[in-house]
């Protein structure tokens, strides 16, 4: 009888140990599964963060005038594309930072919150179509106040709003920064324009949210207004020869594209490949 009681007691202890082990195993399996999912999620996030981003393919500069050596670089075009494996990049949330060592300028695209009281619209600085000359604008090059496109009436409007082409984008960017308007909300806006170069899925077609996806190429168009020794663009501005320029094209998420070049010691052509 005593042996039977001992045997039953041992069996109860054994069953209890098995149950405890089963519960512990269940907890371990559940915990390991949770940790595995967290690790995979973190890995995906890290991979996306590393892979996502924008790259600068080339940077070109433009010097106005028949004798380029007598002038500065007044306009830049940056050709950008997403990194391999990157998700979509909304250029409306991209910032372009450029420094010449003396000053640092931050360019942006149209912002509906910032520009809601302005006459500027995203359609005025966004171009889709064939590009015969990305710097097409020289006949209007406004180095002094009061120079307007042929047939343009500054008393009625200050932006080109119809039949937007490359020249119109340059003009509208110029007008947004310089006081060519009676609307004080349309002054000092340091914007960049966008020209669609390659867009297989039409993700860049949206003027409000032009987005870079795999294989897309966009041209970011900007004036070098801030690089002016007397803060008066009307009498000349831009990047002079032998200037070290650094900066970044910064997306909302992911790695930024690097801008790093030195302007030539002399300017011999109107269009220069800088990077």
Curated annotation (Swiss-Prot):
Signal peptide: none annotated. Keywords: Archaeal flagellum. One of its GO terms (biological process) is archaeal or bacterial-type flagellum-dependent cell motility. The keyword Oxidoreductase does not apply. InterPro entries: Flagellin/pilin_N_arc, Flagellin_arc. GO terms for cellular component: archaeal-type flagellum. It is found in: Archaeal flagellum. Pfam families: Arch_flagellin (PF01917). GO terms for molecular function: structural molecule activity. Residues 1-4 form a propeptide. Belongs to the archaeal flagellin family. Flagellin is the subunit protein which polymerizes to form the filaments of archaeal flagella. PANTHER family: FLAGELLIN B1 (PTHR35903:SF1). This is Flagellin B5. It comes from Thermococcus kodakarensis (strain ATCC BAA-918 / JCM 12380 / KOD1) (Pyrococcus kodakaraensis (strain KOD1)). The lineage of its organism: Archaea, Methanobacteriati, Methanobacteriota, Thermococci, Thermococcales.
């Amino acid at each position: 009888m005593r042996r039977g009681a001992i045997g039953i007691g041992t069996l109860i202890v054994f069953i209890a140990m098995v149950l405890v082990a089963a519960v512990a195993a269940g907890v371990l399996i559940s915990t390991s599964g949770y940790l595995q999912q967290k690790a995979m999620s973190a890995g995906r996030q890290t991979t996306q963060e590393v892979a996502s981003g924008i790259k600068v393919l080339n940077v070109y500069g433009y010097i106005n005038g028949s004798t380029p050596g007598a002038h500065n670089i007044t306009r830049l075009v940056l050709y950008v594309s997403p990194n391999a494996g990157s998700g979509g990049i909304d250029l409306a949330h991209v910032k372009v930072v450029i420094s010449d060592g003396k000053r640092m300028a931050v360019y942006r695209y149209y912002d509906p919150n910032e520009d809601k009281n302005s006459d500027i619209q995203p359609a005025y600085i966004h171009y889709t179509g064939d590009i015969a000359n990305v710097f097409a604008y020289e006949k209007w090059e406004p180095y002094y106040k009061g120079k307007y496109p042929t047939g343009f009436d500054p008393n009625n409007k200050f932006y080109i709003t119809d039949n937007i082409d490359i020249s119109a984008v340059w003009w509208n960017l110029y007008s947004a920064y310089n006081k060519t308007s009676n609307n004080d909300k349309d002054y000092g806006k340091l914007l960049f324009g966008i020209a669609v170069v390659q867009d297989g899925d039409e993700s860049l077609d949206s003027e409000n949210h032009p987005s870079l996806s795999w294989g897309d190429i966009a041209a970011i168009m900007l004036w070098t207004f801030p690089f002016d020794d007397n803060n008066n663009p009307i009498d000349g501005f831009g990047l002079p020869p032998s200037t070290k320029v650094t900066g970044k094209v910064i997306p909302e998420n992911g790695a930024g594209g690097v801008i790093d070049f030195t302007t030539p010691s002399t300017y011999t052509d109107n269009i220069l490949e800088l990077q």
